[in-house]
Curated annotation (Swiss-Prot):
<dbReference type="Pfam" id="PF01926">
    <property type="entry name" value="MMR_HSR1"/>
</dbReference>
<keyword id="KW-0963">Cytoplasm</keyword>
<dbReference type="InterPro" id="IPR014100">
    <property type="entry name" value="GTP-bd_Obg/CgtA"/>
</dbReference>
<dbReference type="GO" id="GO:0003924">
    <property type="term" value="F:GTPase activity"/>
</dbReference>
<dbReference type="Pfam" id="PF01018">
    <property type="entry name" value="GTP1_OBG"/>
</dbReference>
<dbReference type="GO" id="GO:0005737">
    <property type="term" value="C:cytoplasm"/>
</dbReference>
<dbReference type="GO" id="GO:0005525">
    <property type="term" value="F:GTP binding"/>
</dbReference>
<dbReference type="InterPro" id="IPR036726">
    <property type="entry name" value="GTP1_OBG_dom_sf"/>
</dbReference>
<keyword id="KW-0342">GTP-binding</keyword>
<dbReference type="InterPro" id="IPR006073">
    <property type="entry name" value="GTP-bd"/>
</dbReference>
<keyword id="KW-0479">Metal-binding</keyword>
<comment type="function">
    <text>An essential GTPase which binds GTP, GDP and possibly (p)ppGpp with moderate affinity, with high nucleotide exchange rates and a fairly low GTP hydrolysis rate. Plays a role in control of the cell cycle, stress response, ribosome biogenesis and in those bacteria that undergo differentiation, in morphogenesis control.</text>
</comment>
<feature type="binding site">
    <location>
        <begin position="310"/>
        <end position="312"/>
    </location>
    <ligand>
        <name>GTP</name>
    </ligand>
</feature>
<feature type="binding site">
    <location>
        <begin position="191"/>
        <end position="195"/>
    </location>
    <ligand>
        <name>GTP</name>
    </ligand>
</feature>
<feature type="binding site">
    <location>
        <begin position="166"/>
        <end position="173"/>
    </location>
    <ligand>
        <name>GTP</name>
    </ligand>
</feature>
<keyword id="KW-0547">Nucleotide-binding</keyword>
<dbReference type="InterPro" id="IPR036346">
    <property type="entry name" value="GTP-bd_prot_GTP1/OBG_C_sf"/>
</dbReference>
């Protein structure tokens, strides 16, 4: 199974079942009466974070997934069966985005965190539900509501406290392998690491998750190479280690290397360059006379930025680890005990808009070149879908709903007259009075 950390899919909740018209025929109910049951509710689409799940591979080739629809009502007052929920398990760290609005719907940061992505439709009423002292034998029933449907992207952004960033071949993989029990592929050529590698680093009875972010290249923020693919994994990190190689084979100028990486981070998101960051010079064992380190240290000192030096190969890492954990403690004091800080856009709340019986949106009336009146109204659409025009009682009920919306009065104000044609929901109607 390959590692898949991005996919797009449409999810649809189940439709509500339809109510029915039926009449009681039991021996002990000689007067009969309405007996049509209600439709069952449609199943929801539920996403749930699971720490045992580490990939979106199972969704990679799925274009459209459906929850079960509710069953139709039955005779003898029997209701339809509710549809089963469709429960999709996703890795912790998955972000869900609505592709139509580009809005983040959910960010899973805890194991077993769940979210109803699409709500199932409510079941329609059968004629038994309309029985009253005034209407003892109603020929009324309803269709079930449609389930919600969304086209979304699912994207894993790895949950790490510390992200190690830099150009390819700066020693990031070597560093994380010496700090933790991670086993990245290490070789002396560019682009050895193609996916982020996570490792747990312990210090004084504390532990942090470090991530080796694959090497960035120039214009990574614009998608060059696998730029966007790599940069998005940095968004959750609270601390960044900016690793710069002192080996002249890797960079002509370490100062220029620093600026290029900072430029790519800034172009991708200003939030990245505002993160707490340690700039670290690696491969000091190659810089024998120390001139390249001194040049970089002086350059950063002029900017008020301290520079740490290490040799990951020789495991000279004690001071760096202590500095990272000290910085982490300052972060905890500032933000509290939350390990992972969500993007600011997650403060917004997602609200799904669909037609309902309580909608009071404005009525839109326009006249075409043929003199027909085109009417648009979300609430009216709801009732046209809800009430089948198959019985006289249903047609009268739909007529009452149209009057409640006030369509007749607004058509008169717009200039409509007797005999004019009204177009709504793909149907044509003639004004009779």
């Amino acid at each position: 199974m390959g590692l898949t950390d991005y996919c797009e899919c449409r999810f649809s909740a189940g439709n509500g079942g339809n109510g029915i018209i039926a009449w009681r025929r039991e021996a002990h109910y000689d007067k009969g009466g309405p007996g049509g049951g209600n439709g069952g509710n449609g199943g929801n689409v539920v996403l749930q974070a699971d720490h045992n799940c580490d990939s979106l591979f199972f969704l990679k080739n799925k274009k459209h997934l459906f929850a079960e629809s509710g069953g139709n009502g039955k005779p003898d007052l029997a209701h339809g069966k509710n549809g089963e929920d469709l429960v999709i398990k996703v890795p912790v760290g998955t972000t869900v985005r609505d592709l139509d609005t580009n809005q983040i719907l959910m960010d899973f940061v805890h194991d077993q965190q769940s979210f109803i992505l699409c709500y199932g439709g409510k079941g329609g009423k059968g004629n038994a539900a309309f029985k009253s002292p005034i209407m003892r034998a109603p020929n009324l029933y309803e269709n079930g509501d449609k389930g919600q449907s969304l086209h979304v992207s699912l994207e894993i952004k790895y949950l790490a406290n510390v992200g190690i960033v830099g150009f390819p071949n700066t020693g990031k993989s070597t560093l994380i392998s010496k700090l933790s029990n991670a086993k990245p592929k290490i070789a002396n050529y560019r682009f050895t690491t193609l996916v982020p590698v996570l490792g747990v680093v312990k210090h004084n009875d504390q532990s942090l998750v470090f991530a080796d972010i694959p090497g960035l290249i120039e214009n990574a923020s614009e998608g060059s190479g696998l730029g966007h693919y790599f940069l998005r994994h940095i968004e959750r990190c609270e601390i960044l280690i900016h690793l710069i190689s002192l080996d002249p084979v890797d960079h002509d100028d370490p100062c220029q290397a620093y600026e290029q990486i900072m430029r790519e981070l800034s172009k991708y998101s200003q939030l990245l360059v505002k993160k707490k960051m340690l700039v670290v010079a690696n491969k000091t064992d190659v810089d024998l006379d120390g001139t390249r380190f001194q040049k970089l240290a002086q350059y950063l000192e002029n900017k008020g930025i301290p520079l740490f030096k290490i040799s990951a190969l020789k495991q000279e890492l004690g001071d760096l680890v202590a500095q990272v954990f000290a910085l982490h403690q300052k972060t905890l004091a500032q933000f509290g005990a939350n390990k992972f800080h969500l993007p600011m856009e997650m403060e917004k709340h997602y609200v799904f808009e669909q037609a309902s019986e309580t909608d009071h949106d404005p009525l839109n009336i326009e006249r075409d070149a043929l003199g027909r009146w085109h009417v648009e109204c979300k609430r009216l659409h709801y009732w046209f879908d809800k009430i089948p025009q198959t019985t006289l009682d249903n047609i009268r009920r739909l007529g009452n709903k149209i009057k409640e919306v006030g369509i007749e009065d607004q058509l008169k104000v717009a200039g409509a007259k007797k005999g004019d044609v009204i177009v709504f929901a793909g149907q044509e109607f003639v004004i009779n009075d």
